[in-house]
Amino acid sequence: MASDKSLLRMYGKYANEILSLEPEMKKLANEDFAIKTQELRDRIANGEHVDDLVVEAYALAREAANRVLGLNAYKVQLVGAIILHFGDIAEMRTGEGKTLTGLFPAYLNSLTGKGVHIVTVNEYLSRRDSEINGQVFDLLGVSVGLNGTRMPKNLKREAYHADITYTTNAELGFDYLRDNMVVDKEHKVQRELNFAIIDEADSVLIDEARTPLIISGGSSSRINLYKAADEFAQKVNEKEDIDIDLETKQVYLTETGMKKAKDFFSLENLFALENTEIFHLILNALKAHFTFKEGVEYTVASGEVELIDQFTGRILKGRAYSDGLQQAIQAKEKVEIEEETTTLATITYQNFYRLYAKLSGMTGTAKTEEEEFIKIYNTRVVVCPTNRPVIRKDEPDYTFGTKHAALKKLIQDIKTVNEIGNPILIGTTSVESSEQIARYLEKAGLNFEMINAKNHDREADIVSQAGQKYAITLATNMAGRGTDIKLSQEVKDLGGLVVFGVERNEARRIDNQLRGRSGRQGDPGMSRFYISMEDDLMIRFASPRARKSFLSLGDEHIKSKFFTRAVTNAQKKLEGLNFDQRKNVLDYDNILAQQREAMYAQRDSILWADNLKVVIKKFQITVAYEMIEENSEIVHGEKTLNAEKLLKSIDGKLVAHKRFVAKDFYNKEKMNLAVQLAEAMLEFYKARVIDIPDDVVLQMERKNVLTSFDKYWTRHIDIASKLKAGIYLQQYAQNNPLAVYVEQATELFNKTKIYIASEVVDVLSKIIIRDPEQNVESQKIEITDEIIDDILKSTGLTKANINNKDINAKFDELIAKADNQNDIKKLSIQRDIMLGLVIEIQKRRENSGNKTVNLGKEEIDQMLAILGIDNIGSTSKEEIISKYEEKLKLAEDDKTKNLINIAKDVIIALYEQIELIKKDASSLKSVIDDDNDGGEVAKTRIG
C-alpha cells in the first residue's frame, strides 16, 4: 500500500496539470460548459475510463465554480478531491473548504450516469450544500436532487434519479430499507448504490456504526415486566448485588444479586431457558439505572426519552435503543413505556455503506481511526496538507483533583480572555456538563450562547456568530460541525478564537476536532483542556491511587506532559474498546447481511420478473423435497419413503387427481423425485389458471410471493435479534457465542426459506379454482380486498352496487364495448368474482351467528352507517335491533331492505365477537411455535 507521502506526490502532479489548464478554461463561454460535459459523457459511454478524465473534468469544474461562486479551488483542495475520487478518506482541517472539494469528484463520477450520493449529517447541511454547489452543477449541465424526510415518494424518486443527490445518512439508509419492502417496483425510489461521498465521514462511519437503522412495526406488550425489572433495579445494593465494569459499561449480578433476583421474581433457576427473557430485562434495567445518565446518553423532553449523539451532542430524532433498553430507560424515568415493536427491516451503517461500488469521505480528523477504516470499509485515510500553516497554540492540559476546582479555574480564565475581547468556544462532553458550566457562567455574570441537545434549533446561526468579538459560546462536543467560525481582522489581531475543552473525550479525534475550530486557514488561535479526576474518562481508567493523590491539590492544578500522555493512552484504550464493540456488532450483522442480500436480491428479481413460473417451480421443488422427508420413516434402521402417505398428501391438492400412483415413487433418488413432483405441481397450477389473462396471474403471483417473503423475513430477523440478545450466555457453557450464533442463525435462515416456499405453494394452490363446466354458484373463488378494489376501480362499480342485478347490467355494458377476446375473457372473470362476492355476503348473512366478521374497516364503517350507529363499542345488542327495525320501516325498495338486513347481521356478529374478546382478554396462554424453529416460547394475550 502506497504511503501518504507518495500518494500526495502523485496527486500533486494531477493538481498541477489541472491548474495548467486554467487559461484554456477561461476562454470558454458559459454555454460551452454543458457541451463539454456531454462530450465527457460520450467518451465514457464509448469505453474511456473515468479515471482518465480526472484532469479535464476537474479543470472544467474549477472554472465553473470560479464563475458561479467566485471561488478558485486551491491546489490542496484539488488534491483532496482526487483522494475522494479514488475511494479514500480525505482528512482536511477545519476551514480548508470541504464543501467545494466534494464538488469535483461528484461531477466527475456523475458523468457515468449511475448517480452520486453526497451524504451529510443533517438536513441543514444537505440543503445548504445543494443550493451552493447546485448553481455550479447547473452551469455544467448536471442535475441535482435534494432528498429529505417526509418527502412524497415521487419527489424522492426524482431526487435519487438526478445525476447528483444530496441526502442525510439516516434518510439514505431508511430509504434503502423501505425500497426493499415495496410490493410494486414503481414504488422504489433509489437506483443502484454507485458512489457515495460522505461529509464528516468519521461521524457517520465510526461514531454511528454502533446503532443500527431499524424499521419497526407491530408490537408486543411487556410493560408489566419492564416495570417489575425497574422495581428490582431500584432495590439493588450497588456495592453488594452488582459489579459494574466501568471500561465497558456492563453490569453483572453478583451471587447475592442473583439470589435477590430469584427471590424477587420467584424463580428457581435464573439461567433456565424459559427465564432468558426476564434475565435480559433485569440486565437492561440495571444498565438503565447504573450506566445511563439523563443528559449524557439521553434526554427527557415532553414525556419522551430521546437519544443524544455521544459525539456531537445532537438529538438523534426517530432513533431508539433496541432489545428493550429503550423501554428500560422509559421505566426508570417514569414516562410512558412504549410497547416493544417487531423489527421489520434493519441494517447497520457499516454494512449499508459497504454496498456501494465506491465509497469515499471527508472529515477534519480520521487518521487516528485509519485501521478501522481499512478493515471495515477498505478505505485509507490520507491527510491533506493545509493551504496555509497552522499557527494555533495548543497549550498543555490543566489537571485538577475535583471538577469544582477545574470549573473555578475555567471561569477565571474565561473572564481574563473575555476582557481582552477574544471570542471563546467552550466544548463539553454532555448536556449535563454544559448545563453545569452554564450555571457557573451565569453566576459569574457572563453573557453566553449555548448549544446542546435541549437547545439545538439555532445551532448553525449561533456557531456562525461564535467568532465575534467578546462572544462566549458553550457547545456539546462538535455541535455545529460543517459551519465555519469566521473571524474579523480585529479578532485576528487580538489572537483569534480561544477554545477551552472541559474534560477529554472518549476519542482523540473528537478533541482534535474541537481544537480545530480555532486556527482555520492560518488564523491565530489557542486551545486548552481542563481535566479533573472526577471526569468520566478518569474514573474509568485512572488508578484509585492516582485519583487520590490529585485530591491533595485542592484548587491547584498541574501541567504535566507525562500525565497528558497517560490521558492519551487512556483514550487509545477506550478507542480500542469502542472499535471492538463496533467490530462485534459487525461480526454478528455480517451473518444477517449475507442473508439480507440474498433475500433482497431474490425479492428484486420477483419485483422485476415478467414471468414467475421459474421461481414458483423452485419453491415447488423445495416443498416436494420437504414432503418426501416428512413422509419418510425409519424401517429396519433405514429411512424409507411411505409412498402411500406421500400420495395422499398431494393427490388432488398439489398435483392433478390420479396423476401418480404409489409405485411411481418407488426406488427414486430423493432430489430426482422432488423435481418430478415439482413439474407435476407446476402443470396442475398452470391448468388451474389457464383461463385467466397472463397479466392478472402475474400480479396475483407477485403479490402472494412477496407477502410470504416479507412475513417470514420479518419473523426471521425478529427471532435472530432475540437469539443475538441472549447468545452471550453461551460463554457460561464454554462455547464461542459468535460461532453458536452463526450456526443457529444459518439453520434459522434455511428454515425461513422452507417456510416461504411452503406458504407460496400452498397459497397459490388455493387462490382461484376454475372449472368451465361448473356454474357460477359452484365456483370456488377466494376474494381478496385488492382484487375487489381493482375491479371496482376499473369498472366504475361502487360497493353499493354489489348485487346480482347491478353487476350483470354493468358487465353486459362493458362486454358489449370490448375490443378483443382477451378483454372479454378478463371481464367475464371479473363478473364471476363479483357474483361470487354476492354469494359470500349471502352466506355470511345466513351464518352470522357462528362466523367471525372478517371485513375491513371501510366495510364495517359502511354497515354502521346503514344502521345509523356511531360507535359499536358503546352500543347494546338491543339498540342494534332497535336501529335495524327503524331503518327497515323506512326502506322503500327490496335493494335497500337487503342491505339493511346484511348490515344488521354483520354488526350483531361483530358485537358478539367484541363481547367475547372483552370476556377473554385478560387470560394469558403459553404458545409454543408450531414450526419448531428452535423452541422459541412466546407469551400471547388472547384477543
From Swiss-Prot:
Q: What catalytic activity is recorded?
A: ATP + H2O + cellular proteinSide 1 = ADP + phosphate + cellular proteinSide 2
Superkingdom of the source? Bacteria
Q: What class of enzyme is it?
A: translocase
- Reported EC number(s) for this entry are 7.4.2.8
Any one Pfam family match given in the protein's UniProt record, by short name: SecA_SW
GO BP annotations, alphabetical order: intracellular protein transmembrane transport; protein import; protein targeting; protein transport by the Sec complex
Concerning PROSITE patterns, the annotation shows: SECA_MOTOR_DEAD
> Which segments does the entry list as coiled coil?
none
GO CC terms of this entry: cell envelope Sec protein transport complex; cytosol; plasma membrane
Write out the function statement from the record: Part of the Sec protein translocase complex. Interacts with the SecYEG preprotein conducting channel. Has a central role in coupling the hydrolysis of ATP to the transfer of proteins into and across the cell membrane, serving as an ATP-driven molecular motor driving the stepwise translocation of polypeptide chains across the membrane.
- State the HAMAP family in the record: SecA (MF_01382)
PANTHER family, per database record: CHLOROPLAST PROTEIN-TRANSPORTING ATPASE (PTHR30612:SF0), SECA INNER MEMBRANE COMPONENT OF SEC PROTEIN SECRETION SYSTEM (PTHR30612)
What name goes with this protein? Protein translocase subunit SecA
| Organism listed in the record | Mesoplasma florum (strain ATCC 33453 / NBRC 100688 / NCTC 11704 / L1)
**Lineage of the native species?**
Bacteria, Bacillati, Mycoplasmatota, Mollicutes, Entomoplasmatales
